[in-house]
Regions:
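Ligand/substrate-recognition segments at binding pockets and active sites
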Residues: 227, 373, 379-450, 491, ...
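Long beta-strand-rich cores associated with HINT superfamily self-processing modules
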Residues: 521-548
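Append "and occasionally in soluble cytosolic enzymes with long acidic Gly/Pro-rich linkers
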Residues: 311-413, 500
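Aromatic- and charge-enriched surface segment that lines or borders ligand/interaction sites
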Residues: 92-140, 173, 267, 309-311
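Extracytoplasmic/peripheral linker and loop segments enriched in polar/acidic and small residues
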Residues: 363-369, 423-432, 457-525, 548
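N-terminal lobe/hinge region of extracytoplasmic solute-binding protein
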Residues: 48-98, 215-216
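Gly/Pro-rich hinge or "lid" segments in bacterial periplasmic/extracellular proteins
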Residues: 81-85, 159, 170, 176-245, ...
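Ligand-site clamp/hinge motif
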Residues: 237-282
Length: 548
């Protein structure tokens, strides 16, 4: 199985192009015509990237599957190109003031929504202020807008205080309270997509649940939506670059069962699947349609620090130290993940242009690849539970896809070795993320794939008021370090603050890193070409072309 080095990829660019494995094994029998057969003469690419999404409202989504769908149907001010560089999106150009506090974006002339109505700079004012609306409760609000003037007043309820303005229909101006070295990356982030005020005010939260009301501005727009079956996105004729979109649409098959996806792929019904059955990995490694590539992100465990005994950091540390990360990633997960020694892993870039993890902890990993059983037992004893005595049976919650159940069963065995009994609760995907976000768990499977390469994107997750802080980790010292990283103009001071924050997080076991992500998928290139994959875990279909 060929894999690519994220270190090399991220040093040059933040995007990777697909590389497969050489083999002469039999491939699926699908053809371009069979893939598009259900839609007549239209060139429809049939794919699977996940089950029914929890949401595809750009302001509310925090999942990769939903993000992949939003990516096809919306376009931000800026985008990431194939080389991982920031490129024009709806904005054809932009300027930054000398002090780094004012960004002026010039929109393309004649932009339209998918329903044909004009899209103007005022739509961005509305959309960005909506992200701050406490009634919307956007999980990314603090991450993407806390550096904008008036954010504190906006998040408290007066969204008009967020200092963004539209001097005219094609000019959008953002005023920052402090310089942000990665703000251009935020302007390319899906949460800050423009959304249409008319459709949201007319339909409320339901606007993002049906083809009739899901108005967008990207290369594709939703034309059919059958919940738990499929979402059909067709080429958006009102997209500014529609003439360069080669396919007529994308059919997202909403399949949660990886075996069902695999069968549909092998039968030729689907040309691309993200969810590959883990039991098939060994037999797929030599196939030239099986791809494995690194992405920036970490598979980790959230521990609910608001519940006993997890409010005791020694309990959390014991659970973390008892994990053999090398065995888990390389044996049980068959090398499709990499063992994590840190929370912030490969691909995240430090202020000096080197990889952040190489400068952490004196250049050494915080965790050894193997379990530290004696250290785990000592931590458990320090917590007042020698050999697990007096500790109640704990519950680990996860959804049942990919390796999640495998990880859960391993944790049962690993933690049993230090005297900790564990029950596993399997939760369907539709219920899992809301449950986790609401804190209705003890221990839960979690993970984060980068939205941009700055390490703050990972470390902000554990800031006490962050909407994605599922374990409710709360350490004022940690918060101060994150706040310093947001406001300082000194790159060295910023780097030191972020490194100290990670050190504190690891010492507190505020969460438990398990493995670094790779993406693995099946893609039939006898049917489709032009799909490209980014280091942020997204597949881009706007350049796709059906063969034949």
């Amino acid at each position: 199985m060929k894999t690519r080095s994220l270190t090399l990829l991220m040093a040059a660019a933040m995007t990777v192009s697909a590389v497969g494995c050489s083999s002469n094994d039999t491939k699926p029998t699908s053809t371009a015509s069979s893939t598009a057969a259900a839609t007549g003469d239209k060139k429809i690419l049939s794919v699977q990237i996940g089950p029914n999404p929890e949401t595809i409202d750009p302001a509310l989504n925090s999942a990769v599957d939903g993000g992949n769908m939003i990516l096809q149907s919306f376009e931000c001010l800026l985008t990431n190109d194939k080389e991982g560089k920031i490129a024009p999106g709806t904005a054809e150009s932009w300027e930054v003031s000398e002090d780094g506090l004012t960004y002026t974006f010039k929109l393309r002339e004649g932009l339209k929504w998918s329903d044909g109505k004009p899209l103007t700079a005022n739509d961005f004012v509305y959309s960005w202020q909506r992200v701050c609306d406490p009634a919307v409760a956007a999980p990314y609000a603090e991450t993407v807008l806390s550096m904008v003037e008036g954010y504190d007043e906006a998040i408290a309820g007066d969204i008009t205080k967020l200092n963004v303005e539209a001097p005219d229909d094609t000019t959008f101006v953002v005023h920052l309270s402090n310089a942000c070295p990665y703000f251009e990356s935020l302007a390319a982030f899906a949460t800050l997509s423009p959304v249409q005020k008319d459709t949201i005010e007319a339909n409320g939260d339901a606007w993002a649940t049906s083809a009739e009301t899901y108005v967008s501005n990207g290369p594709f727009h939703v034309t059919e939506w059958v919940p738990n079956s499929y979402i059909l996105m067709e080429k958006n004729p009102n997209y500014w670059d529609a003439e360069n979109i080669k396919i007529d649409g994308i059919k997202f098959n909403l399949i949660e069962d990886a075996n069902a996806s695999y069968n549909a792929y092998n039968s030729g019904e689907i040309a691309f699947i993200k969810d590959v059955p883990t039991e098939e990995i060994a037999s797929l490694k030599d196939r030239d349609d099986f791809f494995v590539e690194p992405i920036i992100g970490t598979y980790y465990i959230s521990v609910n620090t608001e519940k006993e005994p997890f409010n005791n950091k020694d309990v959390r540390r014991a659970l973390s130290l008892a994990i053999d990360r090398d065995y888990l990633a390389n044996t049980l997960m068959q090398g499709t993940y990499s063992p994590s020694g840190n929370f912030v892993g490969p691909g995240w870039m430090d202020t000096d242009g080197t990889e952040f993890y190489k400068n952490s902890n004196g250049g050494e990993s915080f965790y050894t690849p193997e379990a530290d059983i004696e250290g785990a037992k000592a931590a458990l004893e320090a917590a007042g539970y020698p050999n697990g005595e007096g500790l109640p049976t704990l519950t680990y919650s996860t959804n049942d896809s990919g390796y999640h159940k495998t990880v859960a069963e391993y944790l049962q065995q690993a933690w049993k070795e230090i005297g900790v009994n564990l029950d596993v609760e399997i939760v369907e995907w539709a219920s899992f993320t809301p449950m986790r976000r609401n804190g209705d768990f003890e221990i839960a499977r979690n993970g984060w794939v980068g939205d941009y390469s700055d390490p703050s994107n990972m470390l902000e997750l554990l800031y006490s008021t962050n909407g994605n802080n599922d374990g409710k980790y709360n350490n004022p010292e940690y918060d101060k370090l994150i706040e310093l990283s947001r406001t300082t103009l000194d790159p060295k001071e910023r780097s030191e603050a972020l490194h100290k924050a990670e050190e504190l997080l690891i010492d507190d076991a505020g969460c438990i890193p398990v493995a670094y992500y790779n993406d693995f998928w099946l893609e039939n290139r006898d049917v489709v070409t032009g799909i490209w994959h980014s280091a942020y875990g997204y597949w881009h279909f706007e350049d796709a072309e059906l063969v034949g």
